[in-house]
Design a protein with these regions (language model features):
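Mid-core helix/loop region of P-loop NTP-binding domains shared across ATPases and GTPases
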Residues: 31, 100, 104-144, 150, ...
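Conserved ankyrin/ankyrin-like repeat signature
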Residues: 507-508, 543-544, 576-577
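Ankyrin repeat domain, specifically the short helix-to-loop turn at the C-terminus of the second helix
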Residues: 511-519, 546-554, 579-586
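N-terminal flanking helix/linker immediately upstream of nucleotide/cofactor-binding cores
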Residues: 1-45, 49-63, 117-140, 153-161, ...
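Ankyrin repeat boundary signal
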Residues: 521-525, 557-558, 590
Length: 590
């Protein structure tokens, strides 16, 4: 969570004043009852820079001795599976709180002993409330940045719980306070029910003139810094001309300014005329800037693959992981043969870092050897949320990507990697094989998300590594078991069909049912005594359930606790699966 905060730049002195001096913030900071402040502003207006400054510069407490015991915890959401999780947000906040006040960990011990680290959202929230209610807890301020990038279901749960907490404490002093930042989305208005909350609602968009004034401060500060760093330094007249030219742009945002300043910084031009000429070609919008950046890709095909992998990744990939994944994709496309990792021609890390920057330029950023898109708007540039896509070409990048196609690329990299010969690798040296852990844990998720694009060719590949009698299966599955011990995985000594149904691998299930007409659809796992249909129902895999029902799988087969597939689907809220089972006359009272 610290990396997610620190990826944002520090504020320039004199900026964020539109917020720091606002009466509503000052009132919220003093007040012990009004304890929710929601800050909304459009993309690229510096919300995350503001949140980072609030944490790092100690700007949240009024200046009096009573606030020295205040705990400050934070979470910066990003629109991907790992960083966009409300569960991970609560885990991170509790981790920070317990680090600052170790004695509060007593409120989590019983739940941890019962459920291990895989605690639910509801349990984590309950632990937070118990901890802040401790008489020795002291005040706690939580900053939730970019809440709009939180995954929908846990975002709704977060908002519901924050709202309920504040409604319950609206007449008494509260030790728990929140600052939430987001874009000004109507759906968040509805979820928060702002009119009913004892909250302070600050519309950052209403402060646009002040924000633009502060952006001008950043322009002046950064041009001056760039000018001094040049050899020879840029003279004052050139700097003034550059500043004026950038400040004359009407629709400037922090993000646009950042991209433009990088253009100036990278340029080798040093005369006033040529630098002003450069600015004359600078795009007038962030989207135009993104298009221009990607058109410069030294190898557009490889750049496209890199961006697919970034978009699909369950967590940010490291340079070493990306290097391996990209090499596998390129070698397969070229028809080159390889059987072990030694056959892959990988760059040294620093050389690969430069390669990524040559491929994607300012569209990506690399922090602590992890690769990120420069901003949430970069993802929105590549993927049209409305579903319409444009045909891709090296000169047209906007709206040319889909998540499904991106997951297909990630799936190919993971599947083909896991089919390499790893039999002689001792577990102690697996860290030297950077993609191994990621591929073992996440390939099944990419398979699910690729949908029908996980075609027969990849289905056959997946079928091979789901062969529970093969060493390849045991290799990746044991890694998964080690790193996901509380996910209630079936034991490894089960049928191929049961494993494929557990993970929702539709085309693998289809192949098994086609290739083995007499396959046993009622084989139960050795730990929970559940059938393939029971696992597919529990996990909500509609298409897999349909295939099994077509094979007349027993809809009433009980597990060791007496639960049937219908029980499993009902307990986990899978409505469509419930309907399918009831259509097959599953016993309601079974």
């Amino acid at each position: 969570y610290q990396d997610q905060k620190d990826i944002n730049p520090e504020r320039v002195q004199g900026t964020c004043e539109w917020f720091l001096k606002h009466p509503k913030f000052l009132e919220w900071r003093r007040d012990t009852i009004a304890n929710l402040l929601w800050v909304t502003a459009g993309p690229g207006c510096g919300k995350s820079v503001l949140s980072k400054a609030l944490v790092d510069e100690g700007l949240l407490n009024p200046e009096n001795p009573d606030t020295k015991t205040t705990s400050i915890c934070y979470y910066f959401f990003k629109d991907d599976a790992e960083r966009g999780s409300g569960v991970n947000a609560l885990r991170s906040i509790l981790h920070q709180l317990f680090k600052q006040k170790l004695w509060l960990i007593q409120h989590a011990i019983n739940d941890y002993r019962t459920d291990g680290p895989n605690l639910s959202f509801g349990t984590l929230w309950a632990i937070l409330i118990k901890a802040v209610s401790d008489t020795n807890a002291g005040p706690l301020i939580c900053i939730l940045d970019a809440l709009d990038e939180c995954e929908t279901s846990t975002r709704k749960s977060l908002i519901k719980n924050i709202s309920s907490f504040h409604c319950a404490s609206k007449t008494t002093s509260s030790t728990l306070k929140f600052i939430v930042t987001s874009r000004p989305y109507h759906e968040l208005d509805i979820d928060f029910k702002v009119d009913d909350l004892p909250s302070i609602h600050l519309e950052g968009n209403q402060m646009s003139e002040e924000i633009r004034g502060e952006i001008d401060l950043v322009i002046s500060h950064e041009i001056s810094r760039i000018g001094r760093a040049r050899q020879p330094p840029l003279d004052g007249e050139i700097q003034a001309s550059l500043i004026q030219h950038l400040q004359d742009q009407k629709n400037r945002t922090y993000l646009w300014v950042y991209l433009m300043l990088q253009e100036v910084s990278k340029s080798l031009e040093s005369t006033k005329g040529k630098l002003i000429g450069l600015l004359g070609t600078i795009p007038s919008s962030v989207d135009e800037a993104y298009e221009k950046i990607l058109k410069r890709a030294t190898d557009p095909i490889q750049a496209q693959k890199v961006l697919c992998l970034i978009l699909a990744a369950e967590r940010p990939l490291t340079l070493k992981e990306m290097n391996t994944a990209l090499e596998i994709l390129v070698m397969n496309e070229c028809g080159e043969k390889y059987t072990s990792e030694n056959d892959l021609v990988l760059d040294k890390e620093e050389a690969f870092r430069k390669k990524i920057m040559n491929l994607c330029g300012l569209f990506v950023t690399i922090v602590d050897s992890k690769i990120y898109l420069i901003h949430q708007t970069a993802k929105e540039f590549l993927i049209n949320k409305k579903g319409r896509t444009n045909p891709w070409s090296p000169s047209c990048w906007k709206y040319t990507f889909t998540l499904q196609a991106s997951h297909l690329e990630a799936l190919k990299a993971c599947l083909w990697y896991l089919r390499l010969d790893f039999q002689d690798i001792p577990s102690s040296s697996r860290k030297d094989h950077p993609l191994l852990l990621y591929a073992s844990i996440h390939w099944t998720f990419h398979f699910q998300q690729a949908g029908e694009k996980a075609d027969k060719e990849l289905g056959e590949n997946a079928l091979q590594i789901c062969n529970t009698k093969a060493q390849t299966f045991l290799f990746w599955y044991r890694i998964l078991q080690k790193h996901r011990p509380y996910h209630h995985l079936p034991a490894e000594n089960n049928s191929d069909l049961l494993i494929a149904c557990y993970f929702g691998l539709t085309s693998v299930v289809q192949l098994l049912l086609w290739n083995k007409p007499n396959i046993d659809t009622e084989s139960k796992d050795t730990e929970y005594d559940r059938t393939p249909l029971s696992w597919a129902s529990k996990n909500g895999y509609v298409e897999v359930v349909k295939l099994l029902l077509k094979k007349e799988a027993d809809v009433n087969a009980p597990d060791q606790s007496g639960s049937t597939p219908l029980h499993q689907a009902s307990e986990n809220g899978h409505v469509e699966v419930i309907k399918l089972l009831l259509d097959k006359e599953a016993g309601v009272n079974a």
